[in-house]
Amino acid sequence: MNQKPTAIFLMGPTASGKTDLAIQLRQELPVEVISVDSALIYKGMDIGTAKPSKEELALAPHRLIDIIDPAESYSAANFRSDALREMADITEQGRIPLLVGGTMLYYKALLEGLSPLPQADEKVRSKIEEKAQKFGWATLHKELSLIDPVSAARINPNDSQRINRALEVFYISGKSMTELTEQKGEQLPYHILQFAIAPEDRAILHRRIEMRFHKMIESGFKQEVERLYHRGDLHIDLPSIRCVGYRQMWEHLRGDYDLDEAVFRGICATRQLAKRQITWLRGWKYPIQWLDSLKNSENKEIIKRAFDLTMQNG
């Protein structure tokens, strides 16, 4: 018997049909939707993130969307805390949390808990940035390779934010990020049914991504990014502006290349994101059932059967 309450994970790459399936499930099962998407958290970033429409949200309200301003920071630790709170609230109502999205790091944080990484320290970060201005980030990347070769191998020498964080962790704790991330936190107190949805043919996903990006442009994506660009308090190194599509449109607005090139690069970046998400899922160490994006009614029945079986055994 399952002593833990049940929750459902509906994972998958971008443009795989997660939202549509979640809305259908919300109509037929006692579930409430929690978004697991590091882009949907931002207010005012609706078109480029493919945020569910008002009509879709009326059918299936999503928790943890539109929760912070694009200038604010939000970590996997923030997500875990927020998601656990929402899951507990849903469970107390006698309903089932349905977690939907493609940010695999968030799912991992939920399932395994978080490593005891130190909180950010602005003084330490400022010192690292001063050092970078003097010697360059490539030099700091070499320093990181001596301290933490595993992290250094994973981090691009131009990725200033991640280099800064890895060095900051070492300077504060005296331990490398690799050492600390091997220590796991508290595990998720739920029995999880895990599903991943994607087209069997990768070419179909690529076509979906391209079609969706062009639809975003028609819906005013450039104008959405222009509003962010002209706010004056945002910049390209923020996680919000580094979201796929936004970064490329931002670079277009500052004159790096024309709109056609921005669209092309945005589509390529979205395809690369989807590839990374699928790679995460292929290497997922937990039991997972794959669903074909082209078989939505069949997918719905598979999840309903698994849900019913779990409820009977619980």
Swiss-Prot record:
Protein name: tRNA dimethylallyltransferase
Gene assigned in the entry: miaA
The UniProt record lists the keyword Nucleotide-binding: yes
Described function: Catalyzes the transfer of a dimethylallyl group onto the adenine at position 37 in tRNAs that read codons beginning with uridine, leading to the formation of N6-(dimethylallyl)adenosine (i(6)A).
Residues the record marks as site: Interaction with substrate tRNA: 103, 125
Binding-site list for substrate: 14-19
An annotated Gene Ontology molecular function: ATP binding
Annotated positions binding ATP: 12-19
Protein family: Belongs to the IPP transferase family.
Quaternary assembly: Monomer.
Reactions catalysed, as given in the entry: adenosine(37) in tRNA + dimethylallyl diphosphate = N(6)-dimethylallyladenosine(37) in tRNA + diphosphate
GO biological process: tRNA modification
UniProt cofactor(s): Mg(2+)
Record EC number: 2.5.1.75
Region Interaction with substrate tRNA, residue ranges: 37-40, 161-165, 242-247, 275-282
SUPFAM superfamilies recorded: P-loop containing nucleoside triphosphate hydrolases
